[in-house]
């Protein structure tokens, strides 16, 4: 395994491996059948591991001993049972509280240890979302105040936030599009026909999310340059990781302004 870091001048320096694999777990080893396109994994404070087995429409819960603990493929809500459909994101706070981004069912659900639905977020309404908005959650995270953060499909405005009652509260972490001076120059002098064929400058999508104990949101996004692919968002939605201006992006201790 190759492990490296950067020195003061931005040059690669190879280092001893910080982490190496200790073992592997598969659906076959667990006795529940092979995983099919798993899209997320999460752990709780008790050492349980939660796998979003997306292609099999289920969540697999693995105990601290790496043995199968339970499978969640259906949930109970208001006396009715419904099946999960392409669950793609998870956030676990122990067996008593698990959030699932149930993507193809267009909902985020909170379930207890008996697979009973405690809370559902679906079809949020707001003027800022638009009449044609389709809620397809992909990733989910929850902070200490029970605020729910959701990465949704085809949402470029940022991460959707919901209050403790599941009501839409707005966006956070919106990524501003950076246009180079050369691009601005050509856009200014191009014809209408040329502009219609030019690249659309829309923000990139977020791809992953996690929250630390202090309430900071860590989010990854599709950054082709790799300069801001990981962001650390404060409660105001500002990225507080040092940006790549005179130093390397990713430094938590020194933020350049």
Regions found by a protein language model. Give the residues of each.
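Eukaryotic scaffold repeat domains enriched in small/polar residues
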Residues: 1-257
């Amino acid at each position: 395994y190759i492990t490296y870091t950067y020195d003061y001048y931005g040059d690669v320096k190879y280092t001893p491996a910080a982490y190496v694999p200790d073992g592997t777990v598969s659906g076959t080893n667990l006795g529940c059948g092979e995983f099919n396109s798993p899209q997320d994994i999460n752990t709780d404070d008790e050492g349980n591991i939660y796998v979003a087995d997306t292609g099999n429409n289920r969540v697999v819960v693995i105990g601290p001993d790496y043995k199968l603990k339970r499978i969640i493929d259906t949930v109970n809500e208001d006396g009715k049972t419904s099946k999960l459909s392409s669950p793609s994101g998870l956030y676990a706070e122990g067996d008593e509280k698990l959030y699932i981004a149930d993507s193809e069912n267009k909902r985020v659900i909170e379930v207890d240890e008996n697979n009973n639905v405690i809370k559902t977020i679906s079809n949020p309404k707001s003027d800022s979302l638009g009449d044609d908005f389709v809620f397809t959650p992909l990733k989910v995270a929850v902070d200490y105040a029970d605020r729910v953060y959701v990465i949704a499909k085809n949402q470029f405005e940022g991460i959707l936030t919901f209050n403790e009652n599941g009501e839409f509260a707005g966006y956070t972490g919106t990524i501003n599009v950076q246009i180079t001076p050369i691009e601005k120059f050509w856009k200014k002098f191009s014809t209408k026909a040329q502009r219609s064929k030019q690249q659309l400058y829309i923000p990139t999508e977020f791809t992953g999310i996690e929250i630390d104990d202090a309430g900071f949101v860590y989010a990854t996004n599709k950054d082709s340059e790799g300069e801001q692919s990981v962001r650390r968002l404060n409660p105001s939605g500002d990225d507080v990781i040092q940006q790549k201006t005179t130093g390397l992006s990713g430094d938590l201790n020194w933020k350049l302004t």
